[in-house]
């Protein structure tokens, strides 16, 4: 906590010119991936001061930990602290400009009964526009409301047991039957008991009539089928990034196997969380930046989204694209739940 306070104090110690110099250095380095000299700052900005003044500003920025000099006579390179400054300044600027004009109609063309397609579409859109690796968490079927239960006899010995939940997500399994019962009446009674209840309510015994019954055990077996928790898209973008090594990418793949690591990246509020380099908390991931956030059904979070890129990335673009995708997913699942 102390370090955060010092960082804010350091930023207050920068005058407007020094903030412009720092912003220019980071932006130029992100675009060209080459150390930035004082002369280059003057060439690409509207700062009307001498090269000597800019060099003095750069010395102060280096002293405060925003930039560093990789070797003598080289230009300057932003540190994680410098990248964080750039991201926060960019967010302030983006609030004063128009929102990014993205493929707004794309989500409207997907049927409301096909959430898997929507998640894949969102992942592909984010990975392509942000040039990063995307993980999208699927909604947990146990948290969804049951819309309908169906028992469909298909032969003398088998029937199909189907549970349809919100967003068109269904679980289907064939079951062997040993006696001829009135399956239509059983289906009607099950729908009376289960419709509008969450799967979690049923499995935790909140529907008293079903406690200890064969139907409850059947629902448990259907809902506990293995489902990959995350959709992943855009891995090839990391391989194409010349600021990342294969070793860096290998370390990332090892870390994301642990779902607790992914959960640790998200803040406690609705805001997007951005962690840059050392802020991620793993020495092996210091070359990365990660954008993390949740998407919602109404006011309830139902899944998370993570975007991994090199920390030398287009923060302005990625911030807007990431927020756009989160907002569209929340709109989609909120609308689907109201049908």
UniProtKB/Swiss-Prot annotation:
Molecular functions per Gene Ontology: DNA binding
Coiled coil: none
Top-level taxon of origin: Bacteria
UniProt cross-references to InterPro entries, sorted A to Z: GAF-like_dom_sf, HrcA, HrcA_C, WH-like_DNA-bd_sf, WH_DNA-bd_sf, WHTH_HrcA_DNA-bd, WHTH_transcript_rep_HrcA_IDD
Keywords, ordered alphabetically: Repressor, Stress response, Transcription, Transcription regulation
GO biological process: negative regulation of DNA-templated transcription
The family this protein is said to belong to: Belongs to the HrcA family.
NCBIfam families: hrcA (TIGR00331)
Role summary: Negative regulator of class I heat shock genes (grpE-dnaK-dnaJ and groELS operons). Prevents heat-shock induction of these operons.
Name listed for the protein in its UniProt record: Heat-inducible transcription repressor HrcA
Organism: Thermotoga neapolitana (strain ATCC 49049 / DSM 4359 / NBRC 107923 / NS-E)
Lineage: Bacteria, Thermotogati, Thermotogota, Thermotogae, Thermotogales
């Amino acid at each position: 906590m102390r370090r955060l306070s010092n960082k804010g104090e350091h930023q207050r110690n920068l005058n407007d010119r020094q903030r412009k110099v720092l912003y220019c250095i980071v932006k130029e380095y992100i675009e060209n991936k080459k150390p930035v000299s004082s002369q280059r700052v003057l060439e690409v900005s509207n700062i009307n001061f001498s090269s000597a003044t800019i060099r003095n500003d750069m010395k102060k920025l280096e002293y405060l930990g925003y930039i560093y000099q990789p070797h003598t006579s080289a230009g300057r390179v932003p540190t994680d602290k410098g990248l964080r400054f750039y991201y926060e300044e960019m967010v302030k600027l983006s609030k004063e400009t128009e929102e990014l004009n993205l493929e707004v109609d794309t989500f409207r063309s997907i049927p409301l009964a096909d959430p898997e397609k929507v998640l894949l579409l969102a992942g592909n859109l984010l990975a392509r526009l942000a040039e990063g690796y995307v993980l999208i968490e699927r909604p947990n079927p146990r948290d969804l409301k049951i819309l309908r239960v169906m028992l469909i006899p298909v032969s003398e010995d088998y029937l199909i047991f189907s549970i349809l939940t919100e967003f068109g997500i269904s679980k289907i399994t064939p079951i062997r039957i040993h006696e001829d019962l009135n399956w239509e009446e059983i289906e009607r009674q099950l729908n009376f008991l289960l419709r509008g209840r969450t799967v979690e309510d049923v499995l935790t015994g909140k529907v008293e009539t079903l406690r200890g019954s064969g139907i409850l055990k059947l629902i448990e077996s259907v809902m506990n089928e293995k489902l990959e928790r995350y959709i992943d898209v855009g891995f090839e973008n990391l391989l194409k990034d010349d600021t990342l090594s294969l070793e860096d990418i290998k370390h990332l793949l090892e870390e994301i196997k642990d779902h607790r690591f992914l959960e640790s990246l998200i803040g406690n509020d609705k805001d997007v969380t951005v962690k840059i380099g050392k802020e991620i908390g793993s020495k092996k991931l210091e070359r990365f930046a990660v954008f993390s956030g949740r998407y919602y059904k109404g006011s309830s979070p139902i899944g998370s989204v993570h975007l991994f890129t090199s920390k030398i990335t287009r923060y302005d673009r990625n911030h807007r694209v990431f927020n756009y995708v989160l907002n569209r997913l929340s709109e989609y699942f909120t609308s689907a739940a109201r049908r």
